[in-house]
UniProtKB/Swiss-Prot annotation:
SMART domains: EFP, Elong-fact-P_C. Pathway: Protein biosynthesis; polypeptide chain elongation. GO terms for cellular component: cytoplasm. It is found in: Cytoplasm. One of its GO terms (biological process) is peptide biosynthetic process. Belongs to the elongation factor P family. Keywords: Cytoplasm, Elongation factor, Protein biosynthesis. Pfam families: EFP (PF01132), EFP_N (PF08207), Elong-fact-P_C (PF09285). This is Elongation factor P. NCBIfam families: efp (TIGR00038), PRK00529.1 (NF001810).
Length: 188
């Protein structure tokens, strides 16, 4: 058990019987009241975000984790099959461990898998940016290229992303996997 004051952003704690990742932790001392820590956490079992106010003296259980590089191979029903690049062992990862970024996962992408001290999978971290090909989008007319609007486009993984008007079918684009937003066109 560790004091909440010694926990930082990115740490994984066991709270209410489930593993939670600390997204943000802010120390507050309001007026005549006692100090507290306002935590924004992500439940790693359900994927839901949770807000909680810890007292400044509260103790939490920090989970010892291990990160390993894996390569995404294919999807098997609800699970994603990943391969350890050193031992070539394959494991099935549930979609909830990857989260909404799973829609940008394409074959052979390297990911970091975070394991708990008991060997269970806590979360899967995709690269911050991925480069995907646009497979379907409406054609741009001459008038559209002069405006700064966006249009929907389907990328090779099947995900829909809003892109600028000048992007055409066949273009390679860079996408931020954290927000799902278009970043730039890749010139190859």
């Amino acid at each position: 058990m560790v004091s909440i004051s010694n926990v930082s952003r990115g740490a994984i704690i066991r709270w209410n019987g489930a593993p939670h990742s600390i997204e943000s932790l802010v120390h507050r001392t309001p007026g005549n009241l006692r100090a507290f820590y306002q935590a924004s956490m992500k439940n790693l079992k359900t994927g839901r975000n949770v807000e909680y106010r810890f007292s400044a003296t509260e103790q939490v259980d920090v989970i010892v984790t291990e990160r390993k590089k894996y390569q995404y191979l294919y999807r098997d029903g609800e699970d994603y099959v990943m391969m350890d690049t050193e031992t070539f062992d394959q494991i099935n990862v549930p979609e909830v461990a990857i989260g909404p970024a799973s829609r940008f996962l394409k074959d052979s992408v390297m990911v970091d898998i975070v394991f708990a001290d008991d060997g269970s999978i806590l979360e899967v971290e995709l690269p911050t940016f991925v480069e995907l090909e646009v497979t379907e989008t409406s054609p741009a007319s001459k008038d559209d290229r002069a405006t700064s609007g966006t249009k929907p486009a389907i990328v090779e993984t099947g995900a829909e992303v809003n892109v600028p008007m000048f992007i055409q079918t066949g273009s390679i684009i860079r996408i931020d996997t954290r927000s799902g937003e278009y970043m730039e066109r890749v010139k190859k």
